[in-house]
Amino acid sequence: MIQQESRLKVADNTGAKEILCIRVLGGSGRRYAGIGDVIVATVKDAIPGGNVKRGDVVKAVIVRTVKERRRADGSYIRFDENAAVIIKNDNDPRGTRIFGPVGRELREKKFMKIVSLAPEVL
């Protein structure tokens, strides 16, 4: 469950290490975002020479959340950290690698490129 001012780890190789959620996309009064939801964020920490730099405003899709999510079969999925992948306007990732597992919900929300780059889909 991600909301405004939430800080997330970046799970790709764009050069950003941490982002801060500015807005949850998908409705005027939408407060929370989960796995597979798109947010607008600002880069809070980045490595020198990366594709993005500190202060850039980016779109990102959430790939891991600490808050458990119930699935249709009754099982729950939960991760150890909140993480996101920075995306372009056409929902393709800006980086070329994804680090760590991602949720299966990304496949249902048509983020196929992220699913194919991820080392593990849980």
From Swiss-Prot:
Disulfide bonds: none annotated. It holds the Pfam family Ribosomal_L14. GO terms for biological process: translation. PROSITE patterns: RIBOSOMAL_L14. Coiled coil: none annotated. SUPFAM superfamilies: Ribosomal protein L14. Signal peptide: none annotated. SMART domains: Ribosomal_L14 (SM01374). Belongs to the universal ribosomal protein uL14 family. Binds to 23S rRNA. Forms part of two intersubunit bridges in the 70S ribosome. This is Large ribosomal subunit protein uL14. The gene is rplN.
